[in-house]
């Protein structure tokens, strides 16, 4: 009976919630800025690090030059109001290894040399698409969707039915 009491006591002890970071894929429709795709990361790592950030890839300066070819690019973190006015398309839970891989990819894009942004070949959609592939999402870079963030992200949901409603 004493052992049963000890087992019951152990079962009733509070258990810390499993650490987890959630990555969400967002689109921002045409408004005061051009359409954009980006990711958010929120949660807590196994070592207790609180994560609450977002990343997108864009031109350093939005000028007509982006229509002509490659220009300087940058990883950008948007203000909470921008994120709030954007549309979350889907989310995926990450373990610490996946989170570290995403952060390494963000750093890779942050340190791309030279004129790293190209509206047709390396834009925000290419960035979020590469992140999506990294976390196990099937991605097809359809040419007609490479300037349409929302349509591109919705195409990923169609390719990966398990994302629907996430």
Language-model features: locations:
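Second-shell loop/turn segments in exported
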Residues: 27-28, 86-95, 110-118
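Generic secondary-structure boundary/loop-capping signal
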Residues: 79-80, 89, 114, 143
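Sec/Tat signal peptide C-region and signal peptidase I cleavage site
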Residues: 15-19
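Solvent-exposed, acidic/flexible segments
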Residues: 31-35, 92-102, 117-125
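Bacterial N-terminal signal peptides
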Residues: 5-14
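Activation targets extended, charge/polar-rich intrinsically disordered C-terminal tails
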Residues: 21, 104-166
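Glycine-rich catalytic cores of cysteine/serine-nucleophile enzymes that process amide/ester linkages
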Residues: 20-88
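N-terminal hydrophobic targeting signals that begin at the initiator methionine
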Residues: 1-2
């Amino acid at each position: 009976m004493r052992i049963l009491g000890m087992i019951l006591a152990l079962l009733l002890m509070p258990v810390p919630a499993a650490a987890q970071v959630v990555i969400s894929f967002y689109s921002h429709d045409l408004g005061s800025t051009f359409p954009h795709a980006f990711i958010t990361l929120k949660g807590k790592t196994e070592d207790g690090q609180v994560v609450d950030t977002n990343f997108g890839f864009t031109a350093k300066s939005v000028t007509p030059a982006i229509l002509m070819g490659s220009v300087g690019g940058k990883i950008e973190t948007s203000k909470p109001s921008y994120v709030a006015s954007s549309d979350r398309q889907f989310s995926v839970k990450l373990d610490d290894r996946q989170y570290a891989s995403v952060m390494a990819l963000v750093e890779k894009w942050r340190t791309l040399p030279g004129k790293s942004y190209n509206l047709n070949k390396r834009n925000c959609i290419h960035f979020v698409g590469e992140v999506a592939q990294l976390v196990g999402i099937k991605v097809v870079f359809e040419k007609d969707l490479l300037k349409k963030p929302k349509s591109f992200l919705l195409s990923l949901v169609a390719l990966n039915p398990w994302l629907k409603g996430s």
